[in-house]
Amino acid sequence: LGFGKPLPTAAAITEEGFMSCFSPNTTAAGNRLWCEVSAVVYDGKKLLFANDKDAPAGQSSVFSRNLIQLADTARPTYLMVPPYVAAHKYEDFARTPDGRFVLLTTAFDRVKPGSTDWDGYNTLLYWRTGDEAHPHVLTTDDATSASLGIRQHLASILANDVFPGNMPYFKIEGLAATDDKLFFGVREEGKSYSDFTHRTKIISVSYRIERKGNQERIRLSDDWKLIADFNPARTHPELPRPLALSSLEYDPYHQCFWLLTSLEANGHLDAYLWVIKPEDLYTNKPFTLITNVVGKPLHLGHKAEDLTPLDHQRLLLIHDDDRVQTTIGKRTRQSNQAAYSILSIH
């Protein structure tokens, strides 16, 4: 993987705009609904998006658009099959390097002991590329309808001296896939959703494809490992803090991993892009900060949430600016819109 290939080091924002998730002024339970897109993937033919908020009746948190219609205001195509509606708080897509499978993870950030009420927050879906109408739930055993076994592995891998046994609270915001491994990116960990530390930690697990007749299933191994614990402030103390992981992707074009880190403080949004070779990630080396063409850190004035390679040259970044009315040029974000950026990489 990627030995000897020079890494991209710089990028330029070549296009920015707003995309629509639903009609303007859409409401749910009497409140105005905001488009809070947290995940994007280009599957080779179209873009798939996922929102980290539930959608109103008749719509879905997961939807698709053609790349050429990215900035179009027309209604997107909603994915309405039950598994998409049953899961909540989507955070990141991944695509296998051979392009055969797409995966989509939730945050794994809450569980209700003795109840199935919150199982939807602990769900990892996958499907054959182009067949998103038939998603499977990735489980550690065939008996469950959610991915709770995955949550248990993540919680025990994150255990430390303060929280031995299991990390009580954590939030997954990154998911990446190589030919034989999945990578989970951790943004938050701690005692609870109101008492946590921002992190950029990465956990790996091996997988294989099992074929039965014309069915293909992803099966996980039992070799869960915490492979990286990156602190952006240590490598770049001049950047705002606390920056934490908001996306992790493997790029088959450059055989590297991309990392997005973001922060939101007092309505002020910042994000930065980083890159690393696989062999450096596996040995917990620091990521390299991507600069602009004049060598300064490439700064995005948004809460960049996910990215996807479009081709050898371009990355598409999607921003979940929560309810902040960010601007692009003279345009201001409306509640049904999410900002995006296309970067050309050098």
Can you say where each PLM-predicted feature lies in the sequence?
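Sequence/structural signature of beta-propeller domains
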Residues: G2-H346
